[in-house]
Amino acid sequence: MKIKELPRKAGKEVNLFNGVDLTGWEPYGTEKWYVKDGLLVCESGPDKQYGYLATRDYYDDFDLTVEFKQEADGNSGVFIRSFVEEGVKVNGWQVEVAPKGHDTGGIYESYGRGWLVQIPDEKENILKEGDWNTMRIKVQGDNVQTWLNGQEMVNLNDEKLSLIHIS
């Protein structure tokens, strides 16, 4: 998982995950987050409620690349320009990561307007279920773009985009 800050800063690339432990990350909720064989793993907690793992650092404009493998029939995602309140309530934009037919790469505004961009049916097969996928998320000003396995999924301009916290 790598993030590159865009022009307002030096544009340096930062490895967000060291492959060893959760240094630089803050868990929210009861889900179990841990590192196994160099991979970041999440398991449902005892109460089966939402849980999140957030970076301790904040990023404004950035270009993020994440590799993921969705093995369970669960819902996940990458929150951008969002904030956590009241335990596990996250307000902001989420780039969806979910099984086929559930809009991976789409944009959902949590505790806001709901779906901003859902993925057309013809793009649902870009997701490789049970295999490794690469998600790229680029946020600059009021624009967010997503790519899944090299294919553009979303190009959205939204004037409500503000400060960001990756979760």
Per-segment meaning from a language model:
Residues M1-S167:
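Carbohydrate-interacting regions of secretory-pathway proteins
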